[in-house]
From Swiss-Prot:
Gene Ontology, cellular component aspect: ribonucleoprotein complex; ribosome
Protein purpose: Binds to the 23S rRNA.
PROSITE patterns documented for this protein: RIBOSOMAL_L9
Family matches, as HAMAP family: Ribosomal_bL9
Protein name, per record: Large ribosomal subunit protein bL9
UniProt keyword annotations, A-Z: Ribonucleoprotein, Ribosomal protein, RNA-binding, rRNA-binding
Amino acid sequence: MKVIFTQDVRGRGKRGQVKDVPDGYAQNYLIKRGLAKEATKGNMNTLKRVEANEKAAYEAEKAEAERIKAELEKDDTIVEFKSKAGNDSRLFGSISSKKIVEGLEKQYGIKVDKRKLNLPEPIKTLGYTNVHAKLFKGVEATVRVHVTEQD
């Protein structure tokens, strides 16, 4: 019996895959537990539509990530912060990824999720810092952050 897997089944198939499995296994285990459904013409058409929608959503998300990368990679895109600092250029406080995201949105209107920024520890010194951002699978950018001393 041909079935369409609705979930990953270890050793049998992945979600969205169409496979031929024994009738008893399909009816008594896979279909009963909702792990698969019978591969009828209607279900096959539904599968094709769902795959097309998922691919379109993936392409749209990747295009959006490419657009954001182009904005971030421009020479004039530098996130500016003013902060109080001591004599040794150490900040009183720090600049976290949350503040960087807020600065990007406020200064340039670019929305980026803070979890996409690779900032191992908050910025605690004056000057320029490059922060890497993984926007999408295979799409990475660098956010330039400039921290100056507040008067």
